[in-house]
Amino acid sequence: IVVAADGSQEAVDGHAEVAFCLINVGAVRMYLGSSEPPHTLVRSRLLYDDELYNPSGSLISDGQVALRRDKEERTVLAQLAEVSDVPVITLTDGPVELWGAKSNGEEAAEFQEQLAAYKAALLELKRRGAIAAGYVDKPAANLVVRLLEVAMTPEIELPDMRQLRPLL
């Protein structure tokens, strides 16, 4: 079973007439080698009013929005992963480890709060026996698709793998 999630965000623009922020996360769960169709999920969250501001009254940063998106991606993966007799692999765009911790101030407090929720999602994946992986590559690359193609190809056909494209 492969479960993958990717997110995007529209950061708050302090100069816009209406201040808002949007976090989107899309996910898919596929049962390789099964006739069962993939299960998809899209979750969007609109942040506005008080959600856009730190306790001091300043707008949340782009980094804080990205952190919330990362946390939401892992939360969705934990929800879609299931305990199974076959391996469950979860994939996200980007590293598994969170970077960008601040040492003090409001962003540090936000980071610690989001990190706790992020770690809870990773612990839930572990409890369900899922393998969590992050992937970093250049835009428009299809190496993950190629990896899945290799993984699903019978061993006897691997010598011809350069000509085979079962997922395209």
Q: What residue spans do the PLM features occupy?
A:
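Two-metal-ion RNase H-like nuclease active-site motif
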Residues: 2-10
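Acidic, metal-ligating active-site segments
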Residues: 10-56
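Short glycine/proline- and acidic residue-enriched helix-loop micro-motifs
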Residues: 58-60
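Long, contiguous domain-sized segments
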Residues: 1, 62-89, 94-168
